[in-house]
Each structure stands twice: as C-alpha cells, then as structure tokens.
C-alpha cells in the first residue's frame, strides 16, 4: 500500500478502543492533519448542559447523533479540500451506536433499574427508531464510500476504564464492535484490523500505508496521550461546573422520559 493512494484515513472502533489516542499520535507521527470533531461528552455539554450522557432520552440521543454528524462532516470537508486527513472514527459510528441501542436499550451505561424502566417505556417506539436508523444507515454508508479511502479498525482488547464516565457497558462494546466492522467490510474500501499497544498499532499502520514519519513513535504516543488527557480534563471541568444534584426525583424523571 502507498500513502499516496490513501488521503482520507479512518481510525475506526467502538467506545474506548483508543481511537482518539491512536489518531492523534498518527497525526503527530506523519504530519497528516487530524479531523478535530467534538467528542460525544463535549456535545452533551453544548446541547444539554448539566445532563449526564446516560440520562439522555431517545430524542436527545438522536439530536446528539445529528450534531456530531454535522461537526464531523464540516471538519472532514475542510481537510479533504486541503489534501486529506486522519479521522477519529467515521460517519458510521453514530449509526452503529444507534443500532446497537436497539439491542441493549437506549442507556446501556446506566444503573440496572434505570435500564429496566427505560427499556420498557421505549419499547413501543422501537419500530420507528429502527426505520429511522435504516434511513440514517443508507446515508452514512453512501457518504463513507465516497469520503474515506481506508479504515484501520481497533478491536476491543481491554476493558473500559472504570472511571464512572462511560455511557455504555461491555456488552454494548462487543455488539457495536462486531456491527461496525461488518458495516465497514461491506463498503468495499480496504479495512485493516490493528492490535496491540499504541506503539504497535502505529507501527502497523505506518508500515501498511508506506508513508514517511516526522518523529519517533514513542514521542508521538507520549505527546498524544498528554493531548488527550488535557482535553478530557477540560471537558470534565465543564461537566462538573454544569453538574446538578442527582436527587431521587431527578433520577426518576430521567428514567421515565422517552
């Protein structure tokens, strides 16, 4: 493979597989610009200040998906016009995250009783959500075929960080990982699964692309980890500043919203 043939590179994977660290490090390592699209947690602080990801209603989750899609398309278009990019995920992610929620329920990262209530009250709306996601998927697949050249998929290799801020569970990760890889495989574009440490992943990607590097891999990984850590701390500070008391009344209110 030659880097000249692949201008629009996707680092793919489900939640907490290392997409952001890998895409940031690859950008530093190669000098190829990275798509700067906001994370889901950032978008939640913008659209729904004071709310936790796992408390979002199905309508709010759809709005979140639309907003992330909008930001991603805008950022990718700018860099595409400038010669190419490295993408942290793709337009397929929000679609697959939605289809997985049809199987796990809309709030897989919440408490057991919250999930039981939410899964029950959203059941009548499932046929509509399925039709909506089918239409979303048609659009996402078409755009992915037209706007990406190669996918590097990061599988689920380690458990999520138990920091209490993850909006999903391990079952959700396993299902969405399988669905995402299947969706990518059907596009017709090259897809390569890369495993191992951040350094091993980068070595595999650079070797497959056959492109020059501008710094040492270990340095790129170290700098990327610091960038990601600082970014997450800023988002967490915003979340804390917006946080509201999670009273029993509030818990019941959010659990019973469709």
Task: Indicate residue ranges for each PLM-predicted region.
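A glycine- and Lys/Arg-enriched "phosphate-lid" helix/loop adjacent to the NTP-binding pocket
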Residues: 102-196, 213, 221-222
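Conserved substrate/cofactor phosphate-moiety recognition/catalytic segment
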Residues: 24, 28-71
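P-loop (Walker A) phosphate-binding loop of NTP-binding proteins
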Residues: 14
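Hydrophobic anchor at the beta1->P-loop junction of P-loop NTPases
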Residues: 11
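Conserved glycine(s) of the Walker
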Residues: 18
């Amino acid at each position: 493979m030659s880097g000249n043939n692949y201008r629009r590179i996707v680092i793919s994977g489900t939640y907490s597989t290392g997409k952001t660290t890998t895409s940031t490090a690859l950008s530093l390592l190669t000098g190829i610009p990275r798509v700067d699209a906001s994370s889901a947690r950032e978008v939640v602080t913008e659209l729904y200040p004071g709310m936790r990801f796992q408390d979002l209603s199905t309508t709010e989750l759809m709005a979140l998906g639309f907003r992330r899609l909008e930001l991603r398309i805008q950022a990718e278009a700018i860099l595409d016009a400038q010669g190419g990019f490295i993408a942290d995920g793709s337009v397929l992610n929000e679609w697959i995250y939605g289809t997985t929620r049809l199987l796990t329920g809309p709030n897989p990262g919440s408490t057991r009783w919250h999930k039981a209530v939410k899964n029950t009250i959203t059941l009548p709306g499932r046929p509509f959500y399925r039709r909506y996601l089918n239409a979303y998927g048609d659009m996402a697949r078409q755009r992915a075929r037209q706007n990406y050249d190669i996918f590097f998929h990061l599988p689920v290799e380690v458990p999520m960080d138990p920091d209490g801020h993850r909006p999903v569970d391990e079952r959700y990760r396993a299902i969405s990982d399988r669905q995402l890889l299947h969706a990518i495989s059907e596009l017709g574009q090259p897809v390569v699964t890369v495993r191992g440490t951040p350094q091993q992943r980068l070595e595999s990607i650079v070797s497959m692309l056959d492109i020059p590097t501008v710094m040492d891999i270990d340095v790129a990984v170290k700098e990327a980890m610091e960038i990601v850590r600082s970014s997450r701390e800023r988002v967490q500070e915003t979340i804390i500043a917006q946080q509201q008391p999670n009273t029993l009344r509030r818990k019941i209110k959010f659990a019973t919203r469709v």
